[in-house]
Amino acid sequence: MFLRLFKYLWPERYLPETPAQDPFDENPPPCGPGRVGVLLVNLGTPDEPTRGAIRRYLGEFLSDPRVIEIPRYLWMPILHGLVLTMRPKKLAPRYAGIWMEEGSPLLVYSQRQAAGVRQGLAARGVHAEVELAMRYGKPSIPAAITALRERGCDHILAVPLYPQYAASTTATVVDAVTRHAGRLRDQPALRFVKRFHNDPAYVEAQAGRIAEFWQAHGRPQKLVMSFHGLPRYSIELGDPYYRDCLDTARLLRERLGLREDEVEVTFQSRFGSARWLEPYTEPTLAELARQGVTEVDVVCPGFVADCLETLEEISQECRDAFVAAGGRQFRYIPALNDCPPWIEGLTDLVERQLRGWPTGNP
């Protein structure tokens, strides 16, 4: 009965042709432990500083329900009717102003980080394939996982390059990785790094970056630690991001030997009309200048690679606001990027997370 129904629904002419040689192996070779893959994931970037490329990137980014947590039927008309028609024109010259010869700073530095981890693991005798992916844009997560699988990786460690956990950053990477892996017939074993906001390797590299900058340029009156903002409702719903940011700031302050009154913790990149985490970075800088603070350094510990938010929003827009309010000296301390201590620290973090997996000689 079932066989007759099957033949009726799927006639023979629609079934795949039987190969000349049966691919089924009755005596398959023994399955080894497989290889280990490391997937580093950052946020993403347009392919080029043009309106079209920016529109495609923003369309993917802002369509993620983890990023914009309002009903789709309300948000999608706004996104396609207003945001994607207006924002690309405004952002194109800003991206062009920070573009490097090799491409987008975020992509260039992330590629260097991946290359550094690859070399660092090999130097330690850890056999692992390393790929870089972007949550939005290229190289995509599916493409990177496919590349790892084609090289025999059946264990994959995903490392979202966000020190502080947030549902709109780290969790959406987990969503994307598991969604793609879930479609595979032979699924790899997966691990994820949830956060590394208080990891000694990260804290030491970030503190060292600041100390090295001060050794070369001197110390300011105030150090502003600016983190990417989030809507307050995200925290009220249980997101630990705010706590993670404060923990990172405290650890850096203690490592640098600074008093509490020498450091300001602020939040940047507000989007939309909702109330976000406060204090906001730009108004805080202007207020510091009005209070008589003439020298500030700004560091962005939540960004491990420089991007539009650091090179344009902080280094240019916030500088202008500080100077316009009476400040004299504004300096942006670059992100960790590909500085050797961070590459070493990131390699340490990855190596620890790979323990128990087959990373010996393949």
From Swiss-Prot:
* Stored PROSITE patterns: FERROCHELATASE
Broad class of the protein's primary localization: cytoplasm
Q: Where in the cell is it found?
A: Cytoplasm
Query: According to its UniProt record, in which pathway does this protein act?
Result: Porphyrin-containing compound metabolism; protoheme biosynthesis; protoheme from protoporphyrin-IX: step 1/1
Protein residues bound to Fe cation: H228, E309
First-tier enzyme category under EC: lyase
Q: What reaction is this protein's catalytic activity?
A: heme b + 2 H(+) = protoporphyrin IX + Fe(2+)
Which Enzyme Commission number(s) are listed?
Answer: 4.98.1.1
Q: What UniProt keywords apply to this chain's record, in alphabetical order?
A: Cytoplasm, Heme biosynthesis, Iron, Lyase, Metal-binding, Porphyrin biosynthesis
Mention one GO molecular function.
metal ion binding
**What does the record list as GO biological process?**
heme biosynthetic process
Q: SUPFAM superfamilies this protein is in?
A: Chelatase
| GO terms under cellular component | cytoplasm
InterPro entries in the cross-refs: Ferrochelatase (IPR001015), Ferrochelatase_AS (IPR019772), Ferrochelatase_C (IPR033644), Ferrochelatase_N (IPR033659)
Q: Which family does it belong to?
A: Belongs to the ferrochelatase family.
Q: What does this protein do?
A: Catalyzes the ferrous insertion into protoporphyrin IX.
NCBIfam families (UniProt xref): hemH
Task: Report the protein name in the record.
Answer: Ferrochelatase
